[in-house]
Design a protein with these regions (language model features):
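Charge-rich, low-complexity N-terminal segments
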Residues: 2-5, 15-87
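Intrinsically disordered, low-complexity linkers and terminal tails enriched in Pro/Gly
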Residues: 16-17, 131, 200-202
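Loop-to-helix "switch" segment enriched in basic
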Residues: 8
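Sequence termini and other peripheral, non-core segments
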Residues: 11-12
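C-terminal partner/receptor-binding element of secreted or periplasmic proteins
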Residues: 156-202
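Short helix/strand-capping turn motifs
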Residues: 86-161, 165
């Protein structure tokens, strides 16, 4: 009887839950004011910040021309993530990193991060009477690992009430097989005022 029940559940896909349970989230925070700062060499180069992350994986921030770049892990200048940002002015000087961890093996392996960015929208820019304040918010999913560190996808955090779930879905279903510089980045859910990055052939 148990075998028959198990077979029926397997046919219905109800035994796939343990696979999902083998992925968990770990959260860390950073604040550029408390991180090691290296000054930039030019006026529009604001420098870089090395911040603590998860275990031996660091959070590296870089900023210039009112835009930011973020990568994770051992610092590498050639990480594709260090050239990926949003078209509009943006910042992420502090925040909470959600690390997606694969626990199916002997050692837990972080394979993606999710981080909320602040982005200036066209309305922010047009209606500003002083320093521009950003009201746009987007979740950025970044892949980790030997295949490179790069953006996998984006979710407009204000246009989608389930933004966190959408971002986790991008991470869990795509990050581990995503080919940096080859695969198209994913935009999931509705898009409001935030201008999303575009791949060259789109």
């Amino acid at each position: 009887m148990l075998a028959r029940i198990g077979g029926a559940l397997l046919a219905l896909g109800l035994l796939s839950a343990p696979a999902a349970a083998q992925i968990e989230s770990v959260y860390t925070t950073f604040d550029a004011k408390k991180c090691k700062h290296q000054k930039g060499r030019e006026v529009e180069d604001y420098g870089s910040w090395l911040c603590p992350g998860y275990q031996n994986l660091r959070v590296l921030l870089s900023a210039g021309d009112q835009r930011m770049y973020v990568t994770f892990g051992p610092w590498k200048k050639d990480a594709l993530a260090m050239s990926q940002t949003f078209p509009g002015f943006n910042d992420v000087y502090q925040g909470t990193v959600e690390w997606r961890i694969d626990k199916s093996g002997a050692q837990p392996k972080p394979f993606a991060t999710i981080l909320r960015w602040n982005i200036v929208t066209p309305n922010d820019r047009d209606n500003a009477t002083g320093p521009i304040k950003s009201t746009g918010r987007a979740l950025v999913v970044t892949r980790l690992g030997p295949g490179g560190v790069c953006h996998v996808g984006y979710v407009d955090a204000k246009a989608n009430p389930d933004a966190n779930e959408l971002a986790r879905k991008i991470a869990d279903e795509n990050a581990r097989t995503f080919k940096c510089g080859k695969d198209k980045r994913i935009v999931s859910g509705k898009v409001g005022e935030v201008g999303m990055p575009q791949d060259e052939d789109e």
